[in-house]
């Protein structure tokens, strides 16, 4: 019997979404989501294997090569995507609850964070609505220059565990609005948000095979990246995994986009107040328990200010209240 966190209502967590249908995983195995608060299992969902990956790519390939989505007028794609966004707006409390339970993000931050992410999707729809997919360009002589923006094809969207909704939803948004089909591969630690995205696509009437969902561990994900039916890989995650994806895609001349690890730096100038700098730095260090790309984990300061700033940061850190992520008193 599948398990879900309190407040999360997913219809088929024990299934995969392939070709417009909720289907059982080939292996019958289930993924377990472990709470960072208690180390207890708080949710389970179906685990895809290599056969499931092939089935999802085949469904996305058929939907792109033979289905209506790539040739649907952009305005109609926008309208369908707006229906997805409207559905997601009603699911913000569930998205927040899923994130807090799986990832350990603060409940006090989860609602505004996911509400903002859904608002961002509406802005992407606005951008797509105004984008000119066919553009005339000035040329020399009498010939007419026309640039036609066409969909790439099948996109493998691979998202990490720390921002599982916003990152995956953005990948899906741009792919769908440009006429591509998608295979979503969420992190095995935080896959529930992708289920809600799949349910939103289903509720919006997105054609079968355009959006597919296959949560898995690394081995099956590697098989997905190697599948020649995938035209583009959109990956956010570790540098190590990104190197592997670049190698595989390079060998088969497939497009890929990598958003990898980094070390964000803050540059503190001579004229910036010490206390303000300390509050800013510690605020990012503690956001999402320090597990986020926007964390300013490195500070470049004048040598003369080093000790002063270090002491101010230490004083700020001593005021941090430790607790479970579902405690709304924690900010």
Predicted regions and their residues:
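Glycine-rich loop-to-alpha-helix module at the N-terminal edge of alpha/beta enzyme cores
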Residues: 42-131
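Rossmann-like NAD(P) dinucleotide-binding subdomain of oxidoreductase/dehydrogenase enzymes
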Residues: 133-276
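Terminal low-complexity tails and localization/encapsulation signals of metabolic enzymes
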Residues: 1-45, 79-83, 131-158, 257
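Short linear capping/connector segments at secondary-structure termini
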Residues: 98-106, 136-141, 326-331
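Structural signal for hydrophobic packing residues in well-ordered secondary-structure cores
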Residues: 64, 68, 85-92, 96, ...
